[in-house]
From Swiss-Prot:
Keywords for this protein: ATP synthesis, Cell inner membrane, Cell membrane, CF(1), Hydrogen ion transport, Ion transport, Membrane, Transport
InterPro entries associated with the record: ATP_synth_F1_dsu/esu (IPR001469), ATP_synth_F1_dsu/esu_N (IPR020546), ATP_synth_F1_esu_C (IPR020547), ATPsynth_dsu/esu_N (IPR036771)
Organism the protein comes from: Anaeromyxobacter sp. (strain Fw109-5)
Topology class, membrane: Peripheral membrane protein
Assembly and interaction partners: F-type ATPases have 2 components, CF(1) - the catalytic core - and CF(0) - the membrane proton channel. CF(1) has five subunits: alpha(3), beta(3), gamma(1), delta(1), epsilon(1). CF(0) has three main subunits: a, b and c.
Principal subcellular localization: membrane
Gene3D superfamilies membership: F0F1 ATP synthase delta/epsilon subunit, N-terminal (2.60.15.10)
Single GO molecular function: ATP binding
Full protein name: ATP synthase epsilon chain
Length: 132
């Protein structure tokens, strides 16, 4: 028996595959899911989502979202999702630097602070996943 993993963004279904294990960056910390996991739902932070298929690891950078587990099916509703091999590292580094520069010029009370902070986290996740 295996898990079905679906990764969906607002733009498209990114992935639908049968896997052995899923590891994801939860809001309360990283966690793993295997066959017959208890049903649950959680918020996701920007970071690395890894799945294992036939003993081989595959990595995605996700920009936050939600994950639901039920009946050996894992559904990821992600703001963004990008396979490690599809990430333009130089573009991600520029996005990280630009967002970090903007963030450093703001106070935490600035209305744009949360959005810039999220951009920094997403860009950092993309760089980390691409470097694997």
């Amino acid at each position: 028996m295996a898990l079905t993993l679906d990764i969906v963004t607002p733009e498209r279904r990114v992935l639908s595959v049968t896997v052995d294990e899923v590891r994801a960056p939860g809001a309360a910390g990283g966690f793993g899911i295997r066959v017959n996991h208890e049903p649950f739902m959680t918020a996701l932070e920007p970071g690395r989502l890894t799945y294992v298929e036939g003993g081989r690891e595959h990595h995605y950078a996700i920009g936050g979202g939600f994950l639901q587990v039920a009946e050996n099916r894992v559904i990821v509703l992600a703001d963004t999702a990008e396979a490690a091999g599809d990430i333009d590292v130089e573009r991600a580094k520029r996005a990280f630097q630009d967002a970090q520069d903007r963030l450093l010029r703001m106070t935490e009370q600035d209305e744009h602070h949360p959005a810039e902070s999220a951009r920094v986290k997403r860009a950092a996740a993309r760089i980390s996943v691409a470097g694997r």
